[in-house]
Every structure is written in structure tokens, then in C-alpha cells.
Swiss-Prot record:
Gene name of the encoded protein: eif3f
Similarity annotation: Belongs to the eIF-3 subunit F family.
Cellular component aspect of the GO annotation: eukaryotic 43S preinitiation complex; eukaryotic 48S preinitiation complex; eukaryotic translation initiation factor 3 complex; eukaryotic translation initiation factor 3 complex, eIF3m
Superkingdom of the organism of origin: Eukaryota
Subcellular location: Cytoplasm
Organism: Dictyostelium discoideum (Social amoeba)
GO molecular function: metallopeptidase activity; translation initiation factor activity; translation initiation factor binding
Protein name: Eukaryotic translation initiation factor 3 subunit F
MPN domain span: 15-146
Known function: Component of the eukaryotic translation initiation factor 3 (eIF-3) complex, which is involved in protein synthesis of a specialized repertoire of mRNAs and, together with other initiation factors, stimulates binding of mRNA and methionyl-tRNAi to the 40S ribosome. The eIF-3 complex specifically targets and initiates translation of a subset of mRNAs involved in cell proliferation.
Keywords, alphabetical: Cytoplasm, Initiation factor, Protein biosynthesis
Amino acid sequence: MQKETSIFLPSQVTVKVHPVVIFNILDHYIRRNVGQDRVIGTLLGFNNDGVLEIRNCFPVVHSETEQIAVEMEYQRKMLDLHLKSSPREPIIGWYATGNDINENSVHINNFYRDEMGNSTPIHLTVDTGLTNDTMGIHAYMAHNLSLNPESSLGSYFSQLPLEILTFEAENAGLESIAQTKYDQQSTSLLSELESLQGSLTKLDEMLESITSYIESVEKGEIQGDPRLGRFLAKTIQALPKANAQVMDKVINNSVKDLLMIVYLSSLTRSQLAVATKISHSLSN
């Protein structure tokens, strides 16, 4: 065990978690049994040179009444099913809701350590109690306290650096959800045309900001950042070499195609609604 711990030092490990994992944990908590204080589950992902990326998870049945009990047989069956579809995402740890790490957490962590062949599992906590009006998300790793390899005095959990890692598609969903951050109103996903308009508006704002920055540097009002300059130069070099007329034509054709898709989708919905009403009338 000490050999495993010496490999995964807190200063060498960074944990990255995808938003879908957090949403799955929250969904598990909402669907918990009556009277259950917290829920636990298995974390799935991979280790890339000290960067532990959590890509998925699934719930595990457990009980913390008189004694701790974890349905590890259920956990094994779920893991086997997952590995059939995603063989590159093995078990890397476990999650729990709440903000506390107690004695039961140590026992559950030992269960997962045994399931992982004595490797060190990652423990992810999600504070569903919203302490200080914040849903704290933290990652930990357990270490043994011992005077010699034969005996153990106990365990302690050290916190690890944690980042939320998102794909482009996930960003679109998160931006839509964030619209209701400061109010209680619901929101709906944008249509393709509205999403395109929003993206072009943001692009226009960023171009204005970059133009203003470059003009300020040229006038000597601010000092330029060489790293930013290199990044802008690399970005410009990556742009396709085409004149303005060709670019306008390509964009206009794309917009026309999108409008045609929107029109056909609306027409299809109307036809389906009419067909449903006719079918309902004939059945009566």
C-alpha cells in the first residue's frame, strides 16, 4: 500500500471532472431513498501522466445505519457492462454527496481500493447542502499513517487540485443553464438559428475587443503581451485564405441551408400534428 501511495503524491496529481458526472451525481441524490443522508457511486475515467480525468459514473446501493454495507456485487456487474462499451474508462474512485469525510468514508474507500487491486482511489465529494450558498466540489486521496510497513495507525485524506473540464457541446448546454443563475425562471434550449446568432454576436464582440487592444498597443497606451501577440498571429495564420466575397458567399449559403432545414422541420411538425388529429378523429 505504501508503494502505491508514494506514486500518487498530492503535488503530482490533478483531477479533471466533466459536467455530466456532476449532473449524474445530483440526479442520484434527488432520487435517493427517503431518510438517506447521502449517496455514493463509482467514478470512471483514466490516468494520463498524473492527470486523472473523470468521464463517467454510476450509482451504487449502500447503507450507513448500524454498520456500513456496500453492494459491491452490483458495482461489479455495472462496471462489467460499462467496460463493454467503454473499455478505456476503468474504475478510478468513488463519489459521495455531502461535505464531510467520516469514518464510514474510510471503510468505503477501502472497499474501492480492494476493487482496484490495491491502487489508490480518488474520492469526489459534492456538497448538496450548499454550504455558504455554494455547491462545493472537491477531490481527495487517502493515505496510510504507519510507523512500519506491517502496521497502520489510520488514514487521512488530502485534497487534490480539481478542474471542471468541458467539451464544446457541453459548453453550449452549460451556457443555457447559466441563464437562470440569478432568477427562478426556466429556460429552453436555443434553436439552431438562435444559437448561430448568439455565436456570431460573441465573435463580433471578441473581434472588437481584440481590435481595441491592438490599437491601444500601437498608440503606446498599454504595454503589449508577447504571448498574446504570438497567439493572435498563430490564430490568423490558421484562418483559411479566401477573399471577402468568397467568405460571404460561403456564409450566405450556410445560412440559406439552415433556414431551409428550419422551414422543413416546421412543415414536418405541422403535418404530423394534422395526421395525429385525423387519426384521433377516425378512432373516435
